[in-house]
A protein has these predicted regions:
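Structural helix-adjacent loops and short alpha-helical linkers that scaffold large soluble proteins
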Residues: 7-9, 104
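Catalytic nucleophile-loop/oxyanion-hole region of alpha/beta-hydrolase
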Residues: 29-45
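Catalytic-core regions built around general acid/base machinery
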Residues: 1-7, 195-198
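Aromatic-lined carbohydrate-binding surfaces of glycoside hydrolases
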Residues: 2, 10-31
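Histidine- and aromatic-rich ligand-binding microenvironments
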Residues: 6, 15, 58
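Extracellular glycoside hydrolase catalytic/binding regions
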Residues: 40-68, 72-205, 209, 213, ...
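Chitinase-like catalytic core of GlcNAc-active glycosidases
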Residues: 3, 18-20, 45-51
Length: 243
Protein backbone atom coordinates (compact mmCIF):
# COMPACT_ATOMS: atom_id res chain seq x y z
CA UNK A 1 0.00 0.00 0.00
CA UNK A 2 2.81 2.41 0.83
CA UNK A 3 4.47 1.76 -2.52
CA UNK A 4 1.16 2.01 -4.40
CA UNK A 5 0.47 5.40 -2.82
CA UNK A 6 3.91 6.63 -3.84
CA UNK A 7 3.48 5.38 -7.41
CA UNK A 8 0.19 7.29 -7.69
CA UNK A 9 1.39 10.54 -6.14
CA UNK A 10 -0.59 10.09 -2.92
CA UNK A 11 0.24 10.59 0.72
CA UNK A 12 -0.08 7.58 3.03
CA UNK A 13 -0.94 7.80 6.72
CA UNK A 14 0.34 5.04 8.97
CA UNK A 15 -1.73 5.03 12.16
CA UNK A 16 -1.14 3.15 15.38
CA UNK A 17 -4.78 2.19 15.22
CA UNK A 18 -5.84 1.46 18.77
CA UNK A 19 -8.56 2.93 20.96
CA UNK A 20 -8.23 3.39 24.69
CA UNK A 21 -6.19 4.60 27.57
CA UNK A 22 -2.45 3.82 27.51
CA UNK A 23 -1.36 1.32 30.09
CA UNK A 24 -3.83 -1.50 29.62
CA UNK A 25 -6.45 -2.68 27.17
CA UNK A 26 -9.83 -1.64 25.81
CA UNK A 27 -12.72 -3.89 24.80
CA UNK A 28 -15.75 -2.82 22.82
CA UNK A 29 -19.10 -4.60 23.01
CA UNK A 30 -19.68 -7.56 20.69
CA UNK A 31 -22.10 -6.69 17.89
CA UNK A 32 -24.25 -9.49 16.46
CA UNK A 33 -26.23 -6.95 14.39
CA UNK A 34 -23.20 -6.66 12.10
CA UNK A 35 -22.32 -10.33 11.70
CA UNK A 36 -23.39 -13.54 13.50
CA UNK A 37 -21.19 -14.13 16.55
CA UNK A 38 -19.35 -10.87 15.86
CA UNK A 39 -16.60 -10.72 18.51
CA UNK A 40 -15.74 -7.83 20.75
CA UNK A 41 -12.85 -5.71 19.53
CA UNK A 42 -9.94 -5.75 21.95
CA UNK A 43 -7.26 -3.07 21.76
CA UNK A 44 -4.05 -3.68 23.67
CA UNK A 45 -3.00 -0.17 24.63
CA UNK A 46 0.25 -0.73 26.48
CA UNK A 47 2.61 2.20 25.87
CA UNK A 48 5.63 -0.07 25.51
CA UNK A 49 3.99 -1.79 22.55
CA UNK A 50 3.27 1.59 20.94
CA UNK A 51 6.91 2.60 21.34
CA UNK A 52 8.07 -0.73 19.90
CA UNK A 53 5.69 -0.30 16.97
CA UNK A 54 7.00 3.14 16.09
CA UNK A 55 10.63 2.13 16.50
CA UNK A 56 9.99 -0.57 13.90
CA UNK A 57 7.65 1.22 11.51
CA UNK A 58 9.23 4.69 11.54
CA UNK A 59 12.63 3.13 10.92
CA UNK A 60 11.25 1.20 7.95
CA UNK A 61 9.26 3.98 6.28
CA UNK A 62 10.79 7.13 7.75
CA UNK A 63 12.70 8.12 4.61
CA UNK A 64 9.66 7.89 2.34
CA UNK A 65 8.55 11.52 2.12
CA UNK A 66 4.93 10.72 1.25
CA UNK A 67 4.37 8.88 4.55
CA UNK A 68 2.77 10.59 7.57
CA UNK A 69 2.75 9.02 11.02
CA UNK A 70 -0.40 9.24 13.20
CA UNK A 71 0.98 8.41 16.62
CA UNK A 72 -2.15 6.96 18.30
CA UNK A 73 -5.59 6.54 16.81
CA UNK A 74 -7.98 7.47 19.63
CA UNK A 75 -6.82 8.05 23.19
CA UNK A 76 -9.84 7.61 25.48
CA UNK A 77 -11.04 6.58 28.90
CA UNK A 78 -13.23 3.58 29.64
CA UNK A 79 -16.44 2.90 27.75
CA UNK A 80 -18.52 3.43 30.89
CA UNK A 81 -17.06 6.86 31.68
CA UNK A 82 -17.47 10.33 30.25
CA UNK A 83 -13.70 10.49 29.73
CA UNK A 84 -13.58 13.62 31.88
CA UNK A 85 -10.73 12.15 33.91
CA UNK A 86 -8.72 11.51 30.76
CA UNK A 87 -7.81 14.98 29.61
CA UNK A 88 -4.95 16.58 27.70
CA UNK A 89 -2.72 16.77 30.78
CA UNK A 90 -3.07 13.02 31.36
CA UNK A 91 -2.59 12.05 27.72
CA UNK A 92 0.14 14.48 26.60
CA UNK A 93 3.18 12.71 28.16
CA UNK A 94 2.37 9.54 26.20
CA UNK A 95 1.76 11.51 23.02
CA UNK A 96 5.08 13.32 23.38
CA UNK A 97 6.85 10.01 24.04
CA UNK A 98 5.53 8.59 20.78
CA UNK A 99 6.43 11.74 18.85
CA UNK A 100 9.97 11.58 20.20
CA UNK A 101 10.15 7.90 19.26
CA UNK A 102 9.18 8.59 15.65
CA UNK A 103 11.64 11.50 15.50
CA UNK A 104 14.55 9.17 16.18
CA UNK A 105 13.94 7.69 12.74
CA UNK A 106 12.26 10.29 10.54
CA UNK A 107 11.78 14.00 9.85
CA UNK A 108 8.41 13.37 8.17
CA UNK A 109 5.17 14.99 9.28
CA UNK A 110 3.77 13.55 12.50
CA UNK A 111 0.03 13.63 13.22
CA UNK A 112 -0.57 14.28 16.91
CA UNK A 113 -3.79 13.12 18.57
CA UNK A 114 -5.69 14.31 21.62
CA UNK A 115 -8.08 12.85 24.21
CA UNK A 116 -11.76 11.91 23.99
CA UNK A 117 -11.30 9.69 20.94
CA UNK A 118 -9.14 12.37 19.26
CA UNK A 119 -12.09 14.76 19.24
CA UNK A 120 -10.89 17.44 21.68
CA UNK A 121 -7.91 19.76 21.16
CA UNK A 122 -9.25 22.50 23.41
CA UNK A 123 -6.45 22.22 25.98
CA UNK A 124 -3.54 22.09 23.53
CA UNK A 125 -2.54 25.77 23.92
CA UNK A 126 -1.85 25.27 27.63
CA UNK A 127 0.94 22.76 26.90
CA UNK A 128 1.40 21.92 23.21
CA UNK A 129 3.48 19.10 21.85
CA UNK A 130 7.12 19.96 21.23
CA UNK A 131 7.98 19.28 17.60
CA UNK A 132 8.77 21.32 14.50
CA UNK A 133 6.93 19.25 11.89
CA UNK A 134 3.67 18.26 13.53
CA UNK A 135 0.01 18.53 12.58
CA UNK A 136 -2.75 18.10 15.18
CA UNK A 137 -5.55 15.70 14.29
CA UNK A 138 -9.23 15.58 15.10
CA UNK A 139 -11.77 12.79 14.55
CA UNK A 140 -15.24 14.29 14.18
CA UNK A 141 -18.58 12.52 13.72
CA UNK A 142 -22.25 13.63 13.73
CA UNK A 143 -22.68 13.31 17.49
CA UNK A 144 -19.21 14.39 18.62
CA UNK A 145 -20.94 17.68 19.33
CA UNK A 146 -23.80 17.12 21.78
CA UNK A 147 -27.38 17.87 20.83
CA UNK A 148 -27.39 20.67 23.42
CA UNK A 149 -24.60 22.52 21.59
CA UNK A 150 -24.64 24.58 18.44
CA UNK A 151 -22.91 22.40 15.84
CA UNK A 152 -20.51 24.98 14.42
CA UNK A 153 -19.69 26.39 17.85
CA UNK A 154 -18.91 22.85 19.00
CA UNK A 155 -16.47 22.30 16.13
CA UNK A 156 -14.86 25.65 16.79
CA UNK A 157 -14.42 24.84 20.47
CA UNK A 158 -12.92 21.39 19.86
CA UNK A 159 -10.49 22.10 17.02
CA UNK A 160 -11.41 25.07 14.84
CA UNK A 161 -9.96 27.72 17.13
CA UNK A 162 -6.57 26.02 17.01
CA UNK A 163 -6.14 26.54 13.28
CA UNK A 164 -5.03 30.15 13.75
CA UNK A 165 -1.95 28.89 15.63
CA UNK A 166 -1.22 25.30 14.55
CA UNK A 167 -1.84 23.13 11.49
CA UNK A 168 -4.80 20.76 11.89
CA UNK A 169 -6.14 17.87 9.81
CA UNK A 170 -9.41 15.99 10.21
CA UNK A 171 -8.00 12.48 9.85
CA UNK A 172 -11.37 10.81 10.45
CA UNK A 173 -14.92 11.92 9.74
CA UNK A 174 -18.00 10.20 8.43
CA UNK A 175 -21.67 9.42 8.95
CA UNK A 176 -24.08 6.49 8.76
CA UNK A 177 -27.83 6.99 8.70
CA UNK A 178 -29.10 3.97 10.61
CA UNK A 179 -26.02 2.34 12.07
CA UNK A 180 -25.74 1.02 15.61
CA UNK A 181 -23.06 3.49 16.67
CA UNK A 182 -24.81 6.59 17.99
CA UNK A 183 -21.67 8.68 17.54
CA UNK A 184 -21.60 8.17 13.76
CA UNK A 185 -25.35 8.29 13.14
CA UNK A 186 -26.21 11.18 10.87
CA UNK A 187 -27.00 12.33 7.33
CA UNK A 188 -25.39 14.22 4.50
CA UNK A 189 -27.65 17.24 4.91
CA UNK A 190 -27.62 17.26 8.69
CA UNK A 191 -23.89 16.71 9.19
CA UNK A 192 -21.62 16.05 6.22
CA UNK A 193 -22.44 19.06 4.06
CA UNK A 194 -22.28 21.67 6.84
CA UNK A 195 -19.17 20.02 8.26
CA UNK A 196 -17.22 20.04 5.00
CA UNK A 197 -18.41 23.58 4.28
CA UNK A 198 -16.96 24.56 7.67
CA UNK A 199 -13.67 22.80 6.86
CA UNK A 200 -13.54 24.59 3.50
CA UNK A 201 -13.95 27.94 5.28
CA UNK A 202 -11.05 27.00 7.55
CA UNK A 203 -9.02 25.63 4.62
CA UNK A 204 -8.60 22.34 6.49
CA UNK A 205 -7.72 19.01 4.86
CA UNK A 206 -9.70 15.88 5.67
CA UNK A 207 -9.73 12.10 5.37
CA UNK A 208 -13.09 10.31 5.20
CA UNK A 209 -13.41 7.09 7.21
CA UNK A 210 -14.03 4.24 6.37
CA UNK A 211 -13.88 2.60 2.90
CA UNK A 212 -15.48 -0.60 4.15
CA UNK A 213 -18.83 -2.46 4.20
CA UNK A 214 -21.19 -2.26 7.21
CA UNK A 215 -19.23 -4.47 9.62
CA UNK A 216 -17.24 -1.32 10.43
CA UNK A 217 -18.77 2.10 11.01
CA UNK A 218 -19.35 4.44 9.35
CA UNK A 219 -19.11 2.42 6.10
CA UNK A 220 -18.84 3.87 2.60
CA UNK A 221 -19.67 0.56 0.90
CA UNK A 222 -22.53 -1.90 0.76
CA UNK A 223 -21.86 -5.54 1.61
CA UNK A 224 -20.81 -6.37 -1.95
CA UNK A 225 -17.63 -4.30 -1.39
CA UNK A 226 -18.38 -2.40 -4.62
CA UNK A 227 -21.55 -0.30 -4.33
CA UNK A 228 -21.17 3.09 -2.66
CA UNK A 229 -23.77 4.01 -0.05
CA UNK A 230 -24.94 7.55 0.80
CA UNK A 231 -21.70 8.36 2.62
CA UNK A 232 -19.51 6.93 -0.14
CA UNK A 233 -21.41 8.77 -2.87
CA UNK A 234 -21.18 12.02 -0.92
CA UNK A 235 -17.40 11.69 -0.52
CA UNK A 236 -16.95 10.80 -4.19
CA UNK A 237 -18.90 13.88 -5.25
CA UNK A 238 -16.92 16.21 -2.96
CA UNK A 239 -13.63 14.84 -4.24
CA UNK A 240 -14.79 15.33 -7.83
CA UNK A 241 -15.77 18.92 -7.02
CA UNK A 242 -12.27 19.58 -5.67
CA UNK A 243 -10.48 18.46 -8.83
Amino acid sequence: MIDMAEENGLYAIISYHVIGRPGGWYESDSDTTMLPNYPAKVHYTDSDMAVAFWNKVAARYGQKKHVLFEIYNEPAGKLDSTNDDFNWAVWRPTGQLLIDTVRKHSNNIILGSGPKYSSDLSEVPSNPYIDTNLVYVAHIYPNTVTKEEDQVAGWEKRFGFLTSTYPVIISEWGFHDGGKDETTRGTAEGFAKPFLDYLDQKNLPWVAYVYHPPDDEPPMLERDWVTLNEFGLFVKKRLEMAQ
